[in-house]
Swiss-Prot record:
This is Translation initiation factor IF-2. Residues 410-577 form the tr-type G domain. It is found in: Cytoplasm. It comes from Tolumonas auensis (strain DSM 9187 / NBRC 110442 / TA 4). Residues 419-426 are annotated as: G1.
């Protein structure tokens, strides 16, 4: 706020100028009417006025509020009549000013600080005393050593002198006496030095203990004084708390007094029942009522000095009356709801809801999630009124809180290159970009959506390169939805192929104009006219023939017709009048996403509206986050990206799904809430859409256990490849073998993936990714089948072979020989023995046989004996005679035929 003069301030606060000047003067500020007043001077004046009027002591430090609530309590009385009892409930609540709490906290901190300082001082004193004791000991030891050294020197000198005297004197006895005297003198000197040292040590220790005791007594006195001061200060607060506790006890006594009438009524009724029973059955032993027993127990506890609440049972009569007719309710149903929650809203048992659903043809459990439409039908069937609720109000509010008032400007067209596999889409784009991208694609085919921004002489164009393989249908559809113009590439030597037709269908479904590029016109067998004729069958008619589609003949190898193609694209964009808001919050679509090992989740976003800046908060499907970094298609860091510009963004919470809308929002907290709501909604809707266990398909569910399953853990480098491969593998499933993808994701193969594959007996497929060291260790120890691929054809073919190996084998009976019965003989060992001539193939003894009579099978069994002459033989070939005994069959007649066959296993394929 700008500074004001005294006169202006007086007008603003509504006081006379003279009075305001006097107040400034009282506050120690000399001001006249025209002087300027600063914020600091205003604050000083305000503090002076507060002190003058006693504002510091005006507000209370503690306030107690008392509340009385009056009501009535209906209790049963004598004769079955209810009696109204007036009751009053008193409550009190004490509020303490924040300054009191702050002062107590500051006081506590000061006490703790003083205690720490005292402890520190005591430790320092103890350390000093210990150091002094050590110094005294060292000094005493040094003095004793010095004294002993001097005495030793003196003794040595005296000993030498005595030795000289002894040498001179012939008296040996005098020398010995002198030596003993020296020895005693040495010992006396040592004892005196030791006694002196001990005395000095004891004196130093005594001084240290006295000093520590004095410090401890001083600290105890200070703490006692502090406790007395706190007791004096908190005496009022403790009194208020005691008063509040007393009032609470008084309230409990009032409640007990109010319930006294209930207890007395119960006792009166029980006494009446006892008197009636006594009149009917005679004398009955007197029995105390529960109220009397409770009263005696309470009195006994009161005598012991203990206070306890006694809970007495109320009347056994139910207060609930069954409704005379069904109650129709107004219920609110969200987008998904469980059967149990729906039953709770309708106030019925869940079993009743399940019965109604079974009558309507659907089976459900109590915890099963059902959709909004099903819940509405069930509730209306049971007679309730249903209100449908939208749960995405927060999401709509967040997405509508955007800048949309800016003017629209022209933008570059977004062009998608589509066509059949290996028709030259990426090579055509390479020539335009002057970069060799096709060589970087595995197998020479595009397996990702590549987004590129190209600046030409006539304007800028953004290209999206889509795959042509059949497995990448979703990626092509995604590219068509995010584009303005579709360039349909058709090889002049190959013509219209299945993916060409599919690309036309995607473009027409998205309502996008098509520009046809007839590629490979430089080949000798190129036939552009045939391509034009074939495309007319799919409503793609050249302008030369009266249609709306431009046809351009190009060669991605030589560059022929490239400029004409770019001019055709720019001409088509001018017709469309493309525009976008540039100075606004950005929005776009996720073209591709992946998990980078060093950078985390990376999403390729095509900006469609506004400008995306580094640091913006992006809501993208189930994920959200702040844009930490942005890179263009060449890997260069950029700070902003306008409309029709593809960028890679880093900073999302997870890998978004390709095709999700990316929107810049204002609040990161709300973005997180919307993302979590979308995740929960997706999970509930997925559960609600699962196939319901209806009565008519129960038998089909019973036979599912016979189907073999191939468990697969799939990891790829980008999200689009995961979707395409998973869709292709699911399409390989048959009635006998099913592909079950138990785990899929973006990024390298981790230890978790390997553990999952080991637990579920699955194979691990890696598409342009590799396993880390920990995962390889588990794969080797568990003998898991791990395979790497870089081309989708190889992956699908090998999975198909693995599924073929899981098919149940097929068995076929193959006839290997035929013998005609010429005569029948009798044998005591075998019974009837047929004398036969082998007419076809070979008759083998261990093979099963059939007996035919008039070309009709009359018996099926096995041979018991096969002989030629009298020798047992393993087989008899065509043109030879033999004797055949059929096991457990004696009705063989001449003219019968014995057919020999074997069962052959045939391996099946998908």
């Amino acid at each position: 706020m700008a500074d004001l003069s005294v006169k202006q301030l007086a007008i603003e606060v509504g006081t006379p100028v003279d009075r305001l000047v006097q107040q400034f003067k009282d506050a120690g500020l000399n001001k006249d009417a025209d002087a300027m007043v600063t914020e600091h001077e205003k604050q000083a004046l305000l503090e002076h006025l507060k002190k003058q009027h006693g504002a510091d002591n005006a507000e209370p430090k503690r306030m107690t509020l008392q509340r009385k609530t009056k009501g009535t309590l209906s209790v049963p009385g004598a004769g079955g009549k209810n009696k109204e009892v007036q009751i009053e409930v008193r409550k009190s609540k004490t509020y303490v000013h924040r300054s009191v709490i702050d002062e107590a906290q500051q006081q506590k901190e000061a006490e703790e600080k003083a205690r720490q300082e005292a402890e520190k001082t005591r430790q320092e004193e103890l350390a000093k005393a210990e150091q002094a004791r050590k110094d005294a000991e060292a000094k005493a030891r040094k003095e004793a050593e010095e004294k002993a050294r001097k005495e030793a020197e003196a003794r040595k000198q005296s000993t030498e002198a005595a030795a000289d005297d002894a040498a001179k004197s012939p008296d040996e006895k005098a020398r010995k006496v002198k030596a003993e005297a020296d020895k005693r003198a040495d010992e006396n000197a040592k004892r005196e030095a030791e006694a002196l040292r001990k005395k000095q040590e004891e004196e130093a220790q005594r001084k240290t203990e006295l000093e520590a005791q004095r410090k401890t007594e001083l600290e105890a006195q200070r703490i006692a004084e502090e406790a007395r001061r706190l007791a004096v200060e908190n005496e009022g607060r403790w009194a208020a708390e005691e008063e509040a506790r007393r009032r609470a006890e008084l309230t409990d006594d009032v409640g007990e007094a109010a319930s006294k009438f209930v207890k007395e009524a119960e006792a009166e009724r029980e006494r009446q029942d006892e008197s009636k029973g006594r009149r009917r059955t005679g004398v009955v032993k007197a029995k105390k009522s529960p109220h009397e027993e409770a009263r005696e127990e309470r009195n006994s506890r009161a005598r012991k000095g203990k206070r306890a609440k006694v809970h007495t049972p109320n009347s056994m009569q139910h207060g609930f009356q069954k409704p005379a007719q069904p109650v129709n309710r107004d219920i609110v149903v969200g987008e998904t709801i469980s059967v149990g929650e729906l039953a709770q809203k309708m106030a019925v048992k869940a079993v009743e809801v399940i019965k109604v659903m079974m009558k309507m043809g659907a089976m459900a459990t109590i915890n099963q999630i059902i959709d909004q439409e099903t819940a509405q039908l069930v509730a209306e069937e049971m007679g309730h009124k249903v209100t449908l609720r939208r749960e995405n109000e927060l999401e709509e509010a967040v997405l509508q809180d955007r800048d949309s008032t800016a003017t629209r400007e022209g933008r570059a067209p977004v062009v998608t290159i589509m066509g059949h596999v290996d028709h030259g889409k990426t090579s055509l784009l390479d020539y335009i970009r002057k970069a060799k991208v096709a060589s970087g694609e595995a197998g020479g085919i595009t397996q990702h959506i590549g987004a590129y921004h190209v600046d030409t002489e006539n304007g800028s164009i953004t290209f999206l390169d889509t795959p042509g393989h059949a497995a990448f249908t979703a990626m092509r559809a995604r590219g068509a939805q995010a584009t303005d113009i579709v360039v349909l590439v058709v090889a002049a030597d190959d013509g219209v192929m299945p993916q060409t037709v599919e690309a036309i269908q995607h473009a027409k479904a998205a309502g996008v104009p098509i520009v046809v590029a007839v590629n490979k016109v430089d080949k000798p067998d190129a036939d552009p006219d045939r391509v034009m004729n074939e495309l007319t069958r799919y409503s793609v008619i050249p302008e030369e023939w009266g249609g709306e589609n431009q046809f351009v003949k190009v060669s991605a190898k030589s560059g022929e017709g490239i400029d004409n193609l770019l001019n055709a694209i720019l001409l088509q964009s001018e017709v469309l009048e493309l525009g976008a808001v540039r100075d606004a919050m950005a929005s776009g679509v996720v073209i591709e996403s992946r998990l980078d090992k060093g950078r985390g989740p990376v999403a390729t976003v095509l900006v469609q509206e506004g400008t995306l800046h580094q640091g913006d908060i992006v809501l993208c499907g189930f994920e959200y986050g702040r844009v930490r970094a942005m890179r263009d298609e060449l890997g260069r860091s950029i700070d902003a990206a306008g409309p029709s510009i593809p960028v890679e963004i880093l900073g999302l919470s997870g890998v978004p799904s390709a095709g999700d809308e990316a929107t810049v929002v204002r609040d990161e907290k709300k973005a997180r809430e919307v993302a979590l709501y979308r995740q929960g909604k997706f999970r509930d809707v997925k559960l609600a859409r699962q196939q319901k266990a209806k009565l008519e398909n129960m038998f089909a569910n019973m036979t599912e256990g016979e189907v073999s399953e191939l468990n697969v853990v799939l990891k790829a480098d980008v999200q689009g490849s995961v979707e395409a491969i998973a869709d292709s593998l699911n399409k390989l499933s048959t009635d006998e073998v099913k592909v079950r993808i138990i785990g899929s994701g973006v990024g390298g193969i981790t230890e978790t993936d390997a553990s999952l594959a080991a637990a579920s007996n699955a194979i691990v497929l890696g598409f342009n990714v590799r396993a880390d060291a920990s995962a390889r260790k588990i794969i080797e120890s568990e003998s898991i089948d791990l395979r790497y691929y870089s081309v989708i054809y190889d992956l699908i073919d090998e999975v198909r072979q693995a599924m073929s190996g899981m098919l149940a084998p097929e068995y076929k009976q193959q006839i290997i020989g035929l013998a005609e019965v010429r005569d029948v003989f009798r044998s005591p060992k075998f019974g009837a023995v047929a004398g036969c001539m082998v007419t076809e193939g070979t008759v083998k003894r261990n093979s099963p046989i059939r007996v035919l009579r008039d070309n009709v099978v009359i018996y099926e069994g096995e041979l018991e004996s096969l002989r030629r002459f009298k020798d047992d033989v393993p087989e008899v070939k065509n043109g030879y005679e033999c004797g055949i005994a059929v096991k457990n069959y004696n009705d063989v007649r001449p003219g019968d035929q014995i057919e020999v066959y074997e069962t052959v296993e045939i391996q099946r394929t998908l």
